[in-house]
Amino acid sequence: KLGVAPLTSMFLFGANQPSRVPNYRRELHDSSGLSIQAANGEWLWRPLNNPKHLSISSFSVENPRGFGLLQRGRDFSQYEDLDDRYDKRPSAWIEPKGDWGKGTVELVEIPTADETNDNIVAYWKPETLAEPGQEMAFDYRLHWTMQENSIHSPDLGWVKQTQRSIGDVRQSNLIRQPDGSLAFLVDFVGPVLAALPEDKTIRSQVTTDDNVELVENNLRYNPVTKGYRLTLRVKVKDSSKPTEMRAYLLREIPAEPGKEPALLVADKAEEKKAAAKEAAKPAVSKESANDQVEIAKADAPKPEAAKPETAKSEAGKADAAKGKGEVAKADAGKADASKAEAAKDKDGKEIQQPETEAAPTHPEPAKTLQVMTETWSYQLPSDE
């Protein structure tokens, strides 16, 4: 297997996968996640894990703009390590030069019992390998930084942190009772979100594979970070299998044809099934190639036909059995309506029914859902 621009790192435990034994260090890792930027400008964030079994995740992307292993979070309180200072570990970012074509970014996560092993590997794998005697060229620039914000796109929010906890339900007595679920709290931040505090049009889009039941999908404004916190509670059906989840935030805006950003799709069978399931939902159309969600609200109010006027008639002589109302004489100005239905009253005089006109309609302008954040793509390892 050819791996281009390989990166290595270490992840022992973190907020998304807490230590299995008591430890004063809340997080212990050189990198917290894998970041990928696609050619269309879409971003994906994959929090790292220390799985019990070898795990390889593949993300299909053509002509990537960049990928890297980043250390998001520079507060000493996250690590509390005076010796190794994980809060000062740099991030590594690969910036391809030119077009690399089709391929995948692969993430390898290797089980480790201590922090001395580099158990994380990321690299680019081209879709087509060269024939014997042919040349392949992949030029790129390697960036080292402790300013992860300089890598992020200002047009999209990003994931500040992913926290994992036991799921619970608040009872009427305010006591939280565990319900057998797992909870994931995903904090989205960034200037584009800070500029829209408590925007009611922002919503979450969540997909999961078939191995999990989503029991809560709750999005709240976070006044501390000036971003949004997404809370997901899930129940895993078969813990011996890994579980895939994806989420991002959307905002309703007027439709702009031809300006629909695509979403990077992890090359996972489970995620493809989840995307197909989302596409089948009413009122939602999802482009399978780009996983882009667009909701149109162009339904106009139904027009009501004008009711015919009722003619004056002698009492007791209305044709109630057939439900036919006699029609009054038409105004002189409407007597020449060519499509009016002719009728006769009891005296044989000819009258005309005015032509029915549809009520005016005022359809709402079409809306679309704009992607506001990078895609959070998380794998819950097997046997967790």
From Swiss-Prot:
UniProt keyword list: Periplasm
Compartments where located: Periplasm
GO biological process, alphabetically ordered: beta-glucan biosynthetic process
GO cellular component, one term: outer membrane-bounded periplasmic space
MF GO annotations: carbohydrate binding; catalytic activity
Biased composition (Polar residues): 370-384
Family matches, as Gene3D superfamilies: 2.70.98.10, Immunoglobulins
Pathway annotation from the record: Glycan metabolism; osmoregulated periplasmic glucan (OPG) biosynthesis
Composition skew (Basic and acidic residues), residue ranges: 294-352
Location of the region described as Disordered in the Swiss-Prot/TrEMBL record: 276-384
Protein family according to the UniProt entry: Belongs to the OpgD/OpgG family.
Role summary: Involved in the biosynthesis of osmoregulated periplasmic glucans (OPGs).
Name of the protein in its database record: Glucans biosynthesis protein G
Gene designation per UniProt: opgG
